[in-house]
Amino acid sequence: MSTLNELIHYCNEYNPIGALLLTGEWGCGKTYLIEKDLTRALEKTHVIVKVSLFGITDANALRSLIRQKWFEVCTPILGQLHKAKEKSSGFLAAFNAALHAVNPLAGSAANVMVSMNMMDVLPIKAEVEDPKTLEKKRVVLVYDDLERVKMDPVQLLGVINDFCENQNFNTILVSESDAVLRHLMKEDATTYHMLREKTISQSLRYIPDFAEILHSILQERIWPSDDYAEYLSEHKALILDVFASDYDQRAKMLLAVEDGKYHNLRALTKGMESFFRIYYHTKEAGVALPDSHLYSFLAYYLAAKSGIRKGGELVLEFTESDLTQFYPGFSQDALTNIEREWIKTGIWDTNLFLEEIGVRSEAGQTDKNN
């Protein structure tokens, strides 16, 4: 069964025994899988509420955030508050506006209720009704950015377990690996294993189909020009080779390699967007753009922005011999020095680029900031 089908199967459990832990390499598309594929597959039966754990420091803050995100997503489904929310700033102002619209004399009551913070008073439920179809929809809580949480791990798992086991929310916890949880609980392994067993009922390793994901990115994203979009599509196989030539074997064997490259889709997408500058200036200058240039640019960009793995650790410092090891098609001669500088520091000079590729332009003909 595919990862997506496993997620769908779990979300259809009416009274989940525990949360599902979805793991996968940093940047490999776990969030894309949830926000695009799973949301699309469950749009008629479920509502996805995403909760970022970034910077959360205590249980009260987490509970408040869960409720806030629930209201932000589920309020439009519950009814007329949706229109008021569109005209107001924030949920509390929306509630006040909606109540006053129903009964102008209720303004003072609305103010009292707002002062109580309605998100802490009104109940949230694991099932809501779609006002258009009157069909029930399950609410799925998705916790992301586990690596960046700052709260006590015992409290973290306790809150997650409360919403899952006691309030019956289907719950997905997204993390790079189970090792993150073990690291959070490193000072008390016994407590960790007890809470993990109680909180997480299923672990699922995401093995992405990068060919399909790349196809979607190329088709759905708005690129700087139609001809550049066509250029990228024509070089889809090369881009996939740069990005994930080593992935299939690793994924099938579930290898945790000590040395290698990261498969970060955000960095790849930004790298393809950035390469438009190279594509544009070479085209304007009438200079041929060999495939090795695209390959080498993306390899250098990926290593600089998402790092490489050395000794099992993420490092951003690398040599070009590292690149030839992890990206066999990388050519030092294909990449200009100004491109290296631009990728690393953001400093760009069109004149220097044109000089490096053999084009002499008249002074003032090009703009350094272009």
Predicted feature residues:
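Pre-Walker A adenine-sensing motif
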Residues: 1-17
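The conserved phosphate-sensing helix
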Residues: 261-272
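Short regulatory helix/loop adjacent to the ATP-binding pocket of P-loop NTPases
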Residues: 180-200
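P-loop NTPase nucleotide-binding core
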Residues: 18-19, 24-25, 31-135, 202
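Conserved Walker B catalytic segment
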Residues: 129-178, 186-190
